[in-house]
Amino acid sequence: MLDYRQRIDTLITKIEKARIAYSRHHIVKIVAVSKNASPEAIQHYYNCSQRAFGENKVQDLKIKMHSLEHLPLEWHMIGSLQENKINALLSLKPALLHSLDSLKLALKIEKRCEILGVNLNALLQVNSAYEESKSGVVPEEALETYSQISETCKRLKLKGLMCIGAHTDDETKIEKSFTTTKKLFDQIKNASVLSMGMSDDFELAIACGANLLRIGSFLFKE
């Protein structure tokens, strides 16, 4: 059985070391990616003071939210959002959508937000590793797309950027994908959230300026 307290304490120790090396004033938030975890495991981490959890699929988000509605949790949608799932996502009122990957999707979400009278906070996903398997706008188009969404959408509110580190063992390539995203982030006025770093590369992401981490297997893998 997992020792939940030990897992999260180990994670926090590693994050603290990387955070202080980057800047003593830097604040880093953990989103525990619970896509393969049971509600019981989430409850254990809640008991360890973890509050933000992320899901890859809208249906899983709905199931977890309903089964744990007695807890004051903060839910994030981190996986790709299909257009036919927009209404379902908006009805759940997540804290943040990490995976807004195009102007087209933004306009469709904005339209549904208007109809339903709700707002949605989101991050623009940047495909900073230029990988065909990944969603997101390419870095060269990121600032213009961000600006277009910000100017056009009133209920869909952009809060910053998200990227997935390059899928490789070459640390320099992973670092480049993070620094590329950080440079874009620094050029966006009022952007506050930089979601970079997962279980295998979060320390490198923090060194590149990440302030929100998406941690799954480090916390939940048996």
From Swiss-Prot:
Domain of life: Bacteria
UniProt GO molecular function: pyridoxal phosphate binding
CDD domains reported in the protein's UniProt record: PLPDE_III_YBL036c_like (cd00635)
Iron recorded as keyword: no
Keywords, in A-Z order: Pyridoxal phosphate
Disulfide bonds: none
Residue positions where N6-(pyridoxal phosphate)lysine is found in the record: K35
Similarity comment: family membership: Belongs to the pyridoxal phosphate-binding protein YggS/PROSC family.
Function comment: Pyridoxal 5'-phosphate (PLP)-binding protein, which is involved in PLP homeostasis.
Protein name from the UniProt record: Pyridoxal phosphate homeostasis protein
